[in-house]
């Protein structure tokens, strides 16, 4: 009987511990940050902590961008504000049903393709990117972008 009683006490304590934890703690910290952010936002939305529509989420992006600018001017923690901005943009992606991790990966791949194209264009001119001005590199970037849109 004592063993059974101890077992029941342990189970009650476990159950209390489970109910004392936050709804959001069930989202794994080992997930890539953008996936984790979307899951956290989705869980928060399930209990009603959400904007009624995407316009509220977009306004939050603008607010967070202003906070990044202020932090860069010495009025705050830049890293924290950039994190808040990324989190807010991720929330917009959740609203419009875009996987933020996949969107970021696609953008990284696009950047690599366009940069490689810039390098090839510079090489065709007998130059290295490091020898070009920012304006010249911007022109190569625009050309790489146009090529992608034509393909």
Predicted regions, residues:
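Flexible "arm" and connector segments at domain edges
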Residues: 1-82, 86-151
């Amino acid at each position: 009987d004592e063993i059974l009683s101890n077992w029941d006490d342990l189970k009650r304590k476990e159950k209390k511990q489970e109910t004392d934890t936050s709804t959001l703690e069930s989202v794994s910290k080992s997930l890539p940050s953008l996936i984790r952010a979307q899951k956290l936002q989705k869980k928060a939305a399930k209990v009603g902590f959400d904007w009624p529509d995407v316009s509220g989420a977009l306004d939050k992006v603008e607010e967070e961008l202003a906070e990044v600018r202020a932090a860069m001017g010495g009025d705050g923690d830049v890293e924290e504000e950039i994190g808040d901005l990324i989190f807010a943009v991720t929330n917009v992606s959740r609203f419009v049903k875009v996987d933020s991790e996949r969107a970021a990966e696609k953008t990284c791949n696009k950047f690599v393709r366009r940069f490689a194209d810039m390098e090839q264009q510079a090489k065709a001119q007998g130059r290295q990117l490091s020898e070009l001005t920012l304006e010249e590199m911007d022109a190569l970037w625009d050309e790489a972008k146009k090529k992608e849109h034509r393909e």
